[in-house]
Each structure stands twice: as structure tokens, then as C-alpha cells.
A protein has these predicted regions:
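Flexible, glycine/threonine- and acidic-rich loop/arm segments that mediate assembly and lattice contacts
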Residues: 1-251, 255-257, 262-317
Length: 317
């Protein structure tokens, strides 16, 4: 489900979520599913032997399956604001709470945007430690198996296979063409990919290349927002705070990564949550805002197949 579908929204919380979606576009594409604060996830690591083809009256192939489970604990993200009594008591002079309500609305909008930006960043760069959720770049690091950290029921070798080191600077036509070949191959590794995640710098270069090759397009996402596409796959452009431009290839420190994702509640990439967007308003808002208003999102990353995600790292501009 999308974040607006999984959240319990009122008129005011729906308005705040709309602002979050405008500022943090990854929320428009990410899939969320309801799950417990501590839940077991089962990655699809089933193994089968032989063939399903059989002769008439012959026994069907039988494979005994043992699930590989992993516990996913939700990371807790939340902020709250309070308005000092000195502001509240202005109503004694004006006789109307309208000014205070406008001030409160502005602060709530700012708070929603701040929360959304931090969560969007951590969807990519969350370390899975120090109270942060696990982000895509920490789940699949730019490293061989020895440099990976096993997570979500996958082995370090499986995680390493989800990364491809491009090792190209996209400043010549030859390098750009070679990169596009790599990108097409990687798209083939992620069946039904529905998002290409890039930072603003690589996004601009990718569109330049795509237009030259006739692979650029445009569509409208489920929120009615126009989005550019590469070979019909939406390009989600994120800030460098989410996908850095200072990754290293061992020599240069101006590299970045691209992520091909199949967002799906089952057998894809999604985010567990038991809250969606959880908003608690000021008490007695219609009289005048007082006390504390709070916004929270409880979530964490879930990946269920190795073909749901591909990282292309060591890309220079």
C-alpha cells in the first residue's frame, strides 16, 4: 500500500501528509505494509531441484522447504512541537484564536516536512544502528561479500551480488553508452522494476543521455504527479543527502550510486509499519492551540528477493 492508504488520516493529517509527499518524493513510490513492531520476515530463498515437467502418472517433483526468517524491528521516528503560553495568551488581546491557529499550522507544516526529509534520507542511508532504520545503501554496500553486513535473512554473498561496480565517468559519449548497456543489464536483473533512484546530479546526466538515445519519456504516478522515465521506468530524483555524491571508488571521492527497485509488498522492497503517518493534534485546536502536537512514523526496510534490488555504484560525472 501507499503511505496515504496505510495511514489513518483526518482532514488535517491528510493535509500534512500531502506536504510531506511534495517535499519527499520517495514516499510517492515506496510501498508500505502493515506489520508488528517486531515481526518475522521470510525472504524468498526457496530452492527447487529437477524439472516440473513430468510424464503421465509420474510423481510430481517434491522439494522440502525450510524457511529462513529474520526479525525486523520498527525504527521510531517522531517529532513534537509546543507553543509557549506567551503566544497562547495573545488571544486575550485580539479576542480571536485565528492568528495563533495560522502560526500553529505553519509550524506543523514545517515539522511535517522536516520529518519526511529525514525519513527519506534514512530510507537510503539509514545505518540500522543508533535508532536508525536500515537503508538501501547499508543493506547493499559497495563492497564484496567480506564488506557486507548480513541482514534481513540474506547472506553477505547474496547482498554483494546485488551490487555492481560501474567504474565509469560519464563525461564522454563512449562511457555514457557503456553505462547505458550496464543499466539495461541491471534492469533485466530486477523484473518489473518500478523505480530508478538517483541523486539530482546523476538524474540530470541520465536524462541528457536518455534524450540523446531516445529512451526518455514521461508518465504520471499514482499520486497524479508527472515523472520522467528511462525506458518506461520512473526516475526518482533525490537530494544528495539521501544519495551522496562523495562515495569512494578507492581513488576518487566524487562517486555516486543508482538503485533499481521493485517496490512491492510481497517479493519486493517495502517498508514495514504499524503506524503509517501518525499525527496527534494540539488539544482543543478549534478554541486555540495549546499543549503539544506530535507526528510519528514507525517503519523499517524489508527486502524479500535478491532480484528486487540492484545497486550500481562507483559512478562519476
Amino acid at each position: 500500500m501507499k503511505i496515504d492508504q496505510i495511514s489513518s488520516l483526518t482532514g488535517r493529517s491528510a493535509g500534512l501528509l500531502t506536504k510531506m509527499l511534495e517535499i519527499a518524493p520517495l514516499f510517492q513510490y515506496a510501498e508500505f505494509r502493515k506489520d508488528y513492531s517486531s515481526a518475522r520476515t521470510i525472504p524468498d530463498k526457496t530452492t527447487f531441484s529437477g524439472s516440473a515437467a513430468r510424464a503421465e502418472n509420474a510423481a510430481l517433483a517434491k522439494d522440502n522447504q525450510v524457511p529462513t526468517t529474520s526479525t525486523v524491528n520498527l525504527a521510531l521516528y517522531g517529532r513534537e512541537i509546543a507553543i509557549d503560553d506567551v503566544r497562547k495568551l495573545d488571544v486575550n488581546i485580539s479576542g480571536s484564536p485565528v492568528g495563533l491557529q495560522k502560526f500553529a499550522d505553519r509550524q506543523l507544516s514545517s515539522l511535517a516536512v522536516k520529518l519526511a526529509q529525514e525519513i527519506q534520507n534514512h530510507m537510503l542511508i539509514g545505518s540500522g544502528a543508533s535508532n536508525e532504520m536500515l537503508g538501501l545503501s547499508y543493506f547493499v554496500k559497495d563492497a564484496a561479500a567480506g564488506g557486507q553486513t548480513a541482514a534481513l535473512g540474506f547472506t553477505t554473498a547474496e547482498q554483494a551480488a546485488m551490487n555492481a561496480q560501474v567504474g565509469l565517468q560519464l563525461n564522454t559519449t563512449a562511457n555514457q553508452d557503456s553505462f547505458i548497456e550496464t543499466l539495461f543489464k541491471a534492469l533485466g536483473d530486477v523484473p518489473n522494476a518500478n523505480a530508478i533512484l538517483v541523486n539530482t546530479n546523476l538524474g540530470a546526466r541520465l536524462m541528457t543521455i536518455a534524450k540523446r538515445l531516445g529512451a526518455a519519456g514521461e508518465t504520471v504516478n499514482s499520486f497524479g504527479v508527472p515523472v520522467t522515465t528511462f525506458n518506461n521506468v520512473p526516475i526518482v530524483t533525490l537530494p544528495t543527502s539521501a544519495i551522496p555524491q562523495n562515495e569512494s571508488d578507492g581513488t576518487n571521492t566524487d562517486c555516486t550510486s543508482l538503485y533499481i527497485v521493485r517496490f512491492a509488498e510481497e517479493l519486493g522492497v517495502c517498508f514495514n509499519t504499524n503506524s503509517g503517518f501518525y499525527f496527534q493534534d494540539f488539544q482543543d485546536y478549534q478554541t486555540y492551540p495549546q499543549g503539544v502536537a506530535r507526528m510519528q512514523v514507525f517503519l523499517n526496510l524489508v527486502v524479500e528477493r535478491t532480484d528486487a534490488l540492484k545497486r550500481l555504484s562507483r559512478i562519476r560525472l
